[in-house]
């Protein structure tokens, strides 16, 4: 399983706030993985409770070399629809037609209003 660890996400954020995150993506497979091309996308997941998962494609395009680790920076602006809730936040590689879940440890984050 590809592991995606990240830093830069505080425990409490506000809607409208721009987050600057650093992702460390580990590819354990003997082949490169192309992200943002074909059907594989990097998405940020915000999970609240058992049934709500908001998924936001990052739009990033890159290749993770075989059996290696890649570090990338990125930004995300917290959307108003997330305000007033606490989420488990993480990243996943999504392939069209497949269910996805966190590719790494999620981080609890509370989203407040502006």
Summary of predicted features, one role per range:
Residues 1-14, 111-114:
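Low-complexity, acidic Ser/Thr/Pro/Gly-rich terminal tails and inter-domain linkers that flank the onset
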Residues 45-61:
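Short beta-strand and strand-turn-strand segments in soluble, beta-rich domains
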Residues 60-70:
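Short proline/glycine- and polar residue-rich coil/turn motifs
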């Amino acid at each position: 399983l590809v592991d995606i660890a990240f830093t830069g996400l505080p425990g409490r954020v506000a809607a409208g706030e721009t987050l600057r995150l650093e992702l460390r993506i580990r590819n354990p497979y003997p082949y490169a993985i192309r992200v943002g091309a074909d059907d594989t996308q990097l998405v940020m997941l915000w999970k609240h409770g058992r049934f709500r998962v908001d998924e936001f494609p990052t739009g990033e395009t890159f290749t993770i070399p075989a059996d290696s680790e890649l570090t990338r920076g990125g930004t995300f602006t917290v959307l108003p629809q997330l305000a007033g809730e606490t989420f488990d936040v993480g990243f996943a590689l999504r392939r069209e037609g497949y269910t996805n879940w966190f590719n790494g440890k999620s981080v609890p984050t509370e989203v407040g209003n502006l």
